[in-house]
A protein has these predicted regions:
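Conserved N-terminal phosphate-binding loop of PLP-dependent enzymes in the Aspartate aminotransferase
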Residues: 1-121
Length: 121
């Protein structure tokens, strides 16, 4: 049953995941960040905060199809525009798999990410 307590727990769990992604991006020194609120999380290719659609660069838009396809290859469903939508049936294992897939993506494509963003600056 979706009680107010369960809603708060879900919000905190979702926010912790988003923060963990930003910690990953910072630790890997990659120009990416996750924003959103609660169960809606958007991945952006930028070091600057994204607060409106005009903040989304051409480089970010160019990299999103690669992120989408790479995460799908890892079994992670993400929207083609870089959005994650968390849901109540998901577990810590689901989020761990998503984070691991993002880590692989960074390891595989960090030089390309930087080059694409430079080319579109």
């Amino acid at each position: 049953i979706y009680t107010p307590q369960r809603a708060q727990e879900f919000l905190e769990w979702s926010e912790a995941f988003r923060l963990s992604l930003n910690e990953l991006f910072a630790a890997r020194d990659v120009p990416m960040h996750a924003n959103g609120m609660g169960s809606i999380i958007a991945i952006h290719f930028s070091r600057k905060p994204t607060t409106r659609t005009s903040d989304i660069s051409a480089g970010c838009q160019a990299l999103r199809p690669l992120l989408h396809m790479e995460l799908l290859r890892e079994g992670i469903l993400i929207c083609s525009r870089g959005d994650f939508f968390l849901s109540l049936p998901m577990t810590d294992e689901h989020l761990s798999r998503a984070r691991d897939a993002l880590e692989k993506f960074i390891d595989r494509h960090k030089p390309l990410i930087n080059e694409v963003l430079r080319a579109h600056a």
